From Swiss-Prot:
UniProt GO cellular component terms: cytosol
HAMAP family, per the entry: Thymidine_kinase
Official protein name in the record: Thymidine kinase
Record's subunit section: Homotetramer.
Entry binding sites for ATP: 9-16, 85-88
Principal localisation: cytoplasm
EC number annotated for this UniProt entry: 2.7.1.21
Keyword set, alphabetical order: ATP-binding, Cytoplasm, DNA synthesis, Kinase, Metal-binding, Nucleotide-binding, Transferase, Zinc
GO molecular function: ATP binding; thymidine kinase activity; zinc ion binding
Residues that hold Zn(2+) according to the record: 143, 146, 180, 183
Localization in the cell: Cytoplasm
Matches recorded under Pfam families: TK
Native organism: Latilactobacillus sakei subsp. sakei (strain 23K) (Lactobacillus sakei subsp. sakei)
GO biological process: DNA biosynthetic process; thymidine metabolic process
Amino acid sequence: MAQLFFRYGAMNSGKSIEILKVAHNYEEQNKSVIILTSGIDNRDGVGIVSSRIGLKREATPIFSDTNIYELVEATNPDAACVLIDESQFLERHHVIEAAKVVDDLNIPVMAFGLKNDFKNELFEGSKYLLLFANKIEEMKTICWFCRKKAIMNLRMNNGLPVYTGEQIQIGGNEAYYPVCRKHYFNPPIQEEIEKEG
């Protein structure tokens, strides 16, 4: 029976590479997949799933007016799986449409994304995935500054931590780091970051 999965993790926890791996495994068995990603994320171009280790793949971009259920039904209602990257950028209606893909088309949907933003608040997509998903799994990584598990995302600008501002900001001079709670509130100064990086 198909289910809606939400796999979340801090920055650098391997979410995008996991999507590429899952897609490869299905396709190696001649099973078709539909890969979706947020149209907001244009770091490597719109409609690209890109991992930090350099692997990339085209995907269908999701915009505010995209209906995920209709998109899947029109693209391939017999797909073996739907994979969604950057799912934190989904809106409530997208998550409900993804759940409908699971319930009405019996296609598993695996959504991958951040749970919380740099202010340590839930993204809209993450909030509704936490509410509607059948299975929720944390993808783990370690803090940029120590060996503890990273559970937060720290935004830095010119060597200083940023705790206010727009939730979604693609590009710019900001850098994001996966961090533990201690280093979220007390990050090392810029010189130490440069030594670590």
